Amino acid sequence: MSALSEILSYLIISFETSFTFHLEFKYKRTGIEKNESGVLVTVPRGKERQSSSEILDVFTQHIATLWPETQSSDQENEEEGEELEDAVAKEINSLQKKNKKELLTPIMLDMPCVYFVKTRPPIDPVRLVEFTCEVGKTKKMTRYTQRLIPIVRTTGVSLDDLEELAKSLIDPLFHEGQEGIKEFAVQANIRNHTVLKKDDIYRTVARIVGKQHMVDLKNFKLLILVQVIKNIIGISIVQNFEELRRFNLNEVYKQPENTKSIPNDSKLDNFDRDKNQIINDKAEHAE
């Protein structure tokens, strides 16, 4: 039995070493790819690794609450007479499942003050971020993490790619089975990219939303977030953006109980109001 126990320990350690190497390899990825979803995280300079460690813990707890079906239901009630061969197979199978179904993957971007946490289905990045910020109103959960920017899906950086992705996300909320006028705004952030301009983004998004809806920079119900990172575009459409202090965990926690919105003269993180004011004109002349 002792020999078999040693074999079991050796196999488990070997597999865990391989699994850890696989995680480290993914951790060293330095870019976001097409057709991914996740959360862009901003941090103080040099605190990317510390932030990723704490936010993964927070997200893991919230995923267990929001999507309990993702949690393992295996009961580790090994019977006393269980064969070691079966125990080896069970342990390796468990590690393989973790490997294949990892729900959160941190990705450093070779850019200061920002990194990406990739998510897998059924995780909804918008719901995860909004829930985390709601919890953050009354509970200090992180030290190094600042803004959480959900990205529902990514695509290439051409105008055609932007239009296709934007349409797929905008239509269900603005057109398909929807009635009435919706107040909206657009926030475009561009990092490490020089070809696509904010005007291009505003013009394209405004045309897809259509003239039947209204831009309202102060009291918008829906905010269309467009992130351009190197050669990738990511988009999400969110609510409660200002109520949740632009998804900034530090600001959410400091928020007074009765505060409902951000003062108009507050400095928005890359939220270029002057640029957004041209959206109405762009929409009228886009067609």
From Swiss-Prot:
Cysteine disulfide links: none
UniProt feature, compositional bias: Basic and acidic residues: 266-287
MF terms (GO), sorted A to Z: protein-tRNA adaptor activity; RNA binding
Coiled-coil ranges (or none): none
Region (Disordered): 257-287
THUMP domain: residues covered: 133-239
SMART domains: THUMP (SM00981)
Entry-linked Gene3D superfamilies: THUMP superfamily
GO terms (BP aspect): tRNA acetylation; tRNA modification
GO cellular component terms, semicolon-separated: cytoplasm; nucleus
Protein name: Uncharacterized protein C25H2.10c
Species this protein is from: Schizosaccharomyces pombe (strain 972 / ATCC 24843) (Fission yeast)
